[in-house]
Curated annotation (Swiss-Prot):
Homodimer. GO terms for cellular component: cytosol. It comes from Saccharopolyspora erythraea (strain ATCC 11635 / DSM 40517 / JCM 4748 / NBRC 13426 / NCIMB 8594 / NRRL 2338). Pfam families: tRNA_m1G_MT. Belongs to the RNA methyltransferase TrmD family. S-adenosyl-L-methionine binds at G113, I137, G138, D139, Y140, V141, L142. This is tRNA (guanine-N(1)-)-methyltransferase. GO terms for molecular function: tRNA (guanine(37)-N1)-methyltransferase activity. It catalyses: guanosine(37) in tRNA + S-adenosyl-L-methionine = N(1)-methylguanosine(37) in tRNA + S-adenosyl-L-homocysteine + H(+). It is an enzyme of class 2 (transferase). Its EC number is 2.1.1.228. Keywords: Cytoplasm, Methyltransferase, S-adenosyl-L-methionine, Transferase, tRNA processing.
């Protein structure tokens, strides 16, 4: 996979050379290019922004600079084209499903905006010759798209063949089956009077798998109940529904005993 990132702060992307991502580059699982947007400016100040039409606070990133950058990096649309990703709090939510889908792409380009954002005409123009997605990593605002790009790149790259030491790690992650991952434990067997759950020390693989599934269901219901509601029909078996009923009943009983009730 090829990944290009366009930014006015190239050093912000240095973490791409570290840890898991750095190893993926060394092993040639991915090729990464980081590009300084200011290289496509033509004035002495290397300006990439201007005041917004219609007034209002902040500045808007200029279309001519972004247009030239995307033309050079992405091409004119006659050959292979990338999927252009624009991190923005106004975008569609980035999810694990998005990461899985993008992991099948040969080429991703991330356009990291700053200030009030990129002139919308840049996105409209790019969409004429390549697939474009405006994506948000959460309901909050950052100072730029670089952190969001790093987050999404790591989520995608770890899914590529040969990147993780154990491929099963990705298969058992939170969201891989629509649920949150349950708790995990390692040595020592007892730490500060807290023992590892007995089932995990039993060697009974079927029982361990069932315990992990139950814990995943319980954690998801209590922390992200909307994920349970969003599961496709037929995802939950009779045991799953039994576990969820028990958790709901337990939570309801706890609420009824809370101070001030009755």
């Amino acid at each position: 996979m090829r990944i290009d990132v366009i930014t006015i702060f190239p050093d912000y992307l240095n973490p791409l050379r570290e840890a898991l991502l750095g190893k993926a580059i060394q092993r040639e699982r991915i090729a990464v290019g980081v590009h300084d947007l200011r290289n496509w400016t033509h004035d002495v100040h290397r300006a990439v922004d201007d005041s917004p039409y219609g007034g209002g606070p902040g500045m808007v990133m200029k279309p001519d600079v972004w247009g030239e950058a995307l033309d050079e990096i992405c091409g004119d649309g006659t050959g292979q084209v990338p999927r252009l990703v624009v991190p923005t709090p106004a975008g569609r939510p980035f999810t694990q499903r998005t990461a899985v889908r993008w992991s099948q792409e040969p080429w991703l380009v991330f356009a990291c905006g700053r200030y009030e954002g990129i002139d919308q005409r840049v996105i409209t123009d790019a969409a004429r010759r390549m697939p474009v997605e405006e994506v948000s990593i959460g309901d909050y605002v950052l100072v730029g798209g670089e952190v969001a790009a790093l987050t999404m790149i790591e989520a995608v790259v770890r899914l590529l063949p040969g990147v993780l030491g154990n491929p099963a790690s990705a298969e058992q992650d939170s969201f891989s089956d629509g649920l949150l991952e349950g708790p995990c434990y390692t040595r020592p067997e007892v730490w500060r009077d807290q023992p590892v759950p007995e089932v995990l020390r039993s060697g009974n693989h079927a029982a361990i798998a069932r315990w992990r599934r139950d814990q995943s269901l319980e954690r998801t219901w209590r922390r992200r109940p909307e994920l349970i509601e969003a599961l496709p029909e037929g995802t939950l078996d009779a045991r799953d529904r039994e576990v969820l009923d028990r958790v709901r009943e337990s939570d309801h009983s706890g609420d009824s005993r809370s101070p001030g009730s009755g």
